[in-house]
């Protein structure tokens, strides 16, 4: 059976050819290897029709042009040579489009990413819509790859090398106006006239290339180029800590093209693409992509979710304000905030105002749209306006009696169908629901701070939570732009449970003489975005350590923090960044002065600050405890799958994405090797390093958590 075509050619009466892109039975247009023959057949027809005046590529999808290449193609490649051949095929196809003798215009609406932007770059002109859905970028680096269909060569020549490097090295996506300003597109128009404008452009001669700014022309020359690549290379190395080989290869390939010409550049691009596709880093990053896509499709339970028309929030503090923002501005739902005093409501409203006003200043949002989104948020000091809310999110202090009181008040003042979702980070949901008259509608919904930035939420049903309550809460989290994982109602849930021993071990090393900056630098080098001690300062030492007694009571001595250290720090009024002093000292708010380790911290905790451990030794001790606890969480069914465990660690605490998450990392080392490392550490440092039974059994049998493919579990 012949596959339905994703590319359809229609020639208008004015001799403009319209090529419509519509991948059958898919929400998003993605480029697949099998489409090459379809496009070549169309190109042949275009060349044979001497009456044609121009060509327009346009998508039939409502919200995307082409979202990139189908990543499964790369997974199907068994060798670097196969992946390289895939890149060369893409390059050849783009070259054939570019070589057409008549103007070729890309009419872009929605996501134009990766291979989609490479196709648009191969066209002679580009027009895009002013719709917020329209974004242009080359995100391949986020999968441990580089653009393989000519993007590394065409983009620098179109918009300048420094701007192109920023886009390719970071995967940064541009909005329509940014793309126009940089010369990436020739015009920005309303969606209603996109095709009309693109057709008119196609009737003209090929658009002449826009002269690059003087700065970009200087940087493209030999001297400027040498300086630029040295500076960018240094900055990139500092940012990636050498953990992402794709960034180094991007610099190498772009520089080759500029120094030796496009032919050498294309050759270097294809070879680098093939080699990068086989790296463990790319395989891990692609596994995270597939896992997160999978999680986003997971409804959480088999029951249909209830309707969601409006939400209430209890508490206008930092978390309440952040939750109100994502509910109104991402989910588009009306939000009513209740706080015991007007200042709390004002704080929450200001939180959303600050976020939206920042977008207006950066020209990412119109002032009218800001006002429209803010109008969705209202406040009250009582329960007026709460009667018909579908779901209430509680974000008050971590106090069990207070939260139980909130449940009682919501059941008294809200509708019979209203769901009560607690944002607790440590209290058992079953205890919060203990006195509820409708316990089946009580659930945990644990956000991470800052709410607008952290992608993960933990959804925690207790034993009596209904399947519909789970499904409805998952539905809300997705509308808020979050990646939800459903976890069991056990102390610490998942993320905080695997994080606590990691941070405890860092503090323990600190008390034994390791320096603050050495510990943090070791874990950043390993691949975490910040070190464990800085993380504690950022979260708030008082907040971050509150869970330790809860975990110690539930799981025993392995969760105990070094004696008296935490109390000594808190008694000295050290809360971290929020009050300007923790393990680090911080400059005045609003000033860009760098944080500095406070030398007074060492005598305060009775340490010398003259450690002997190497960076890998420091990282090993922290990370191994995290891995061990993650395996326990699978064993105790705290998480439903290792997929959720990997996603939770990467999105919740910044576990190095290039390692794929705790379970992929264990697989890459081998369970037997992890057991051997932990047994060695247990001999050196104590029983907290004893590998759990599941890990020992897997090591003995040579088992792994994942199969070899990117998406399959054992």
From Swiss-Prot:
GO annotation, cellular component aspect: cytoplasm
Site (Important for catalytic activity): 118, 140
Reaction catalysis annotation: a (3S)-3-hydroxyacyl-CoA = a (2E)-enoyl-CoA + H2O; a 4-saturated-(3S)-3-hydroxyacyl-CoA = a (3E)-enoyl-CoA + H2O; a (3S)-3-hydroxyacyl-CoA + NAD(+) = a 3-oxoacyl-CoA + NADH + H(+); (3S)-3-hydroxybutanoyl-CoA = (3R)-3-hydroxybutanoyl-CoA
Record region (Enoyl-CoA hydratase): 1-190
EC number assigned by the record: 4.2.1.17, 5.1.2.3, 1.1.1.35
Transmembrane domains' residue ranges: none
Region (3-hydroxyacyl-CoA dehydrogenase): 306-714
Signal peptide limits: none
Protein keywords: Cytoplasm, Fatty acid metabolism, Isomerase, Lipid degradation, Lipid metabolism, Lyase, Multifunctional enzyme, NAD, Oxidoreductase
InterPro entries xref list: 3-OHacyl-CoA_DH_CS, 3-OHacyl-CoA_DH_NAD-bd, 3HC_DH_C, 6-PGluconate_DH-like_C_sf, ClpP/crotonase-like_dom_sf, Enoyl-CoA_hydra/iso, FA_oxidation_alpha_subunit, FadJ
Record's function text: Catalyzes the formation of a hydroxyacyl-CoA by addition of water on enoyl-CoA. Also exhibits 3-hydroxyacyl-CoA epimerase and 3-hydroxyacyl-CoA dehydrogenase activities.
Family, per entry: In the N-terminal section; belongs to the enoyl-CoA hydratase/isomerase family. In the central section; belongs to the 3-hydroxyacyl-CoA dehydrogenase family.
Name used for this protein in its record: Fatty acid oxidation complex subunit alpha
Organism in which the protein naturally occurs: Shigella boydii serotype 18 (strain CDC 3083-94 / BS512)
Native organism taxonomy: Bacteria, Pseudomonadati, Pseudomonadota, Gammaproteobacteria, Enterobacterales
Originating gene: fadJ
């Amino acid at each position: 059976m012949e596959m339905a075509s994703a590319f359809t050619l229609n020639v208008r009466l004015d001799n403009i050819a319209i090529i419509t892109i519509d991948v059958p039975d898919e929400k998003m247009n993605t480029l697949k290897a099998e489409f090459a023959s379809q496009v070549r057949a169309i190109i042949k027809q275009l060349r044979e029709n001497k009456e044609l005046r121009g060509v327009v590529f346009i998508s039939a999808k409502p919200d995307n042009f082409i979202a990139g290449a189908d990543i499964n193609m790369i997974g199907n490649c068994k060798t670097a040579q196969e992946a390289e051949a895939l890149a060369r095929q893409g390059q050849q196809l783009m070259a054939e489009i570019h070589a057409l003798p008549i103007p070729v215009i890309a009419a872009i609406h929605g996501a134009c990413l990766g291979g989609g932007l490479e196709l648009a770059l191969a066209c002679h002109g580009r027009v895009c819509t002013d719709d917020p859905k329209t974004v242009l970028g080359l995100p391949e680096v986020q999968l441990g790859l580089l653009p393989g269909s000519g993007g590394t060569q065409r983009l620098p020549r179109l918009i300048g090398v420094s701007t192109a490097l920023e886009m390719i090295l970071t995967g940064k996506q541009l909005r329509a106006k940014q793309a126009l300003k940089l010369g990436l597109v020739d015009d920005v128009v309303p969606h209603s006239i996109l095709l009309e404008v693109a057709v008119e452009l196609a009737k003209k001669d090929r658009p002449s290339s826009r002269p690059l700014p003087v700065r970009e022309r200087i940087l493209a020359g030999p001297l400027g180029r040498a300086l630029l690549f040295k500076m960018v290379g240094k900055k990139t190395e500092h940012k990636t800590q050498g953990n992402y080989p794709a960034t180094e290869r991007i610099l190498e390939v772009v520089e080759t093209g500029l120094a030796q010409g496009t032919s050498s550049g294309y050759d270097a691009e294809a070879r680098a693409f093939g080699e990068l596709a086989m790296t463990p880093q790319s395989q891990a990053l692609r596994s995270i992509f597939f896992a997160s896509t999978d999680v986003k499709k997971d409804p959480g339970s088999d029951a249909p979710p209830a309707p969601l028309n409006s939400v209430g929030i209890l508490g206008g503090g930092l978390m309440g304000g952040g939750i109100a923002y994502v509910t109104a501005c991402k989910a588009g739902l009306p939000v009513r905030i209740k706080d015991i005093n007007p200042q709390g409501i004002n704080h929450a409203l200001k939180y959303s105002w600050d976020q939206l006003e920042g977008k207006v200043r950066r020209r990412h949002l119109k002032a009218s749209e800001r006002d429209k989104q803010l109008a969705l948020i209202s406040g009250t000091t009582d329960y007026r306006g709460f009667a018909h809310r579908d779901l209430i999110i509680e974000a008050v202090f971590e106090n069990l009696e207070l939260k139980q009181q909130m449940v009682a008040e919501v059941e008294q003042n809200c509708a019979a169908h209203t769901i009560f979702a607690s944002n607790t980070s440590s209290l058992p949901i079953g205890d919060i629901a203990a006195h509820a008259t409708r316990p089946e509608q009580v659930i945990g919904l644990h956000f991470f701070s800052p709410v607008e930035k952290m992608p993960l939420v933990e959804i925690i049903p207790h034993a009596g939570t209904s399947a519909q309550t789970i499904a409805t809460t998952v539905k809300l989290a997705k509308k808020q732009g979050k990646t939800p994982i459903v976890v069991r109602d056990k102390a610490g849930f998942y993320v905080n449970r695997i994080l606590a021993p990691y941070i405890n071990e860092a503090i323990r090393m600190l008390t034994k003489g390791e320096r603050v900056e050495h510990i943090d630098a070791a874990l950043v080098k390993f691949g975490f975005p910040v070190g464990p001690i800085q993380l504690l300062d950022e979260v708030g030492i008082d907040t971050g350590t509150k869970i330790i007694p809860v975990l110690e009571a539930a799981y025993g001595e392995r969760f105990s923090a070094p004696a008296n250290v935490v109390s000594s720090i808190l008694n000295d009024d050290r809360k971290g960044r929020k009050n300007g002093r923790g393990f680090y000292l911080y400059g005045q708010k609003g000033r860009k002065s760098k944080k500095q380790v406070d030398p007074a911290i060492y005598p305060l905790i009775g340490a010398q600050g003259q450690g002997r451990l190497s960076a890998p030794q420091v990282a090993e001790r922290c990370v191994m405890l995290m891995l061990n606890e993650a395996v326990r969480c699978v064993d105790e069914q705290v998480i439903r799958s290792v997929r959720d465990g990997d996603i939770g660690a990467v999105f919740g605490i910044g576990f190095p994405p290039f390692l794929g998450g705790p379970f992929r990392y264990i697989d890459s080392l081998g369970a037997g090797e992890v057991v051997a490392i932990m047994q060695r550490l247990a001999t050196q440092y104590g029983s907290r390093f004893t590998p759990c039974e599941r890990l020992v059994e897997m090591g003995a049998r040579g088992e792994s958590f994942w199969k070899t493919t990117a998406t399959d579990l054992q």
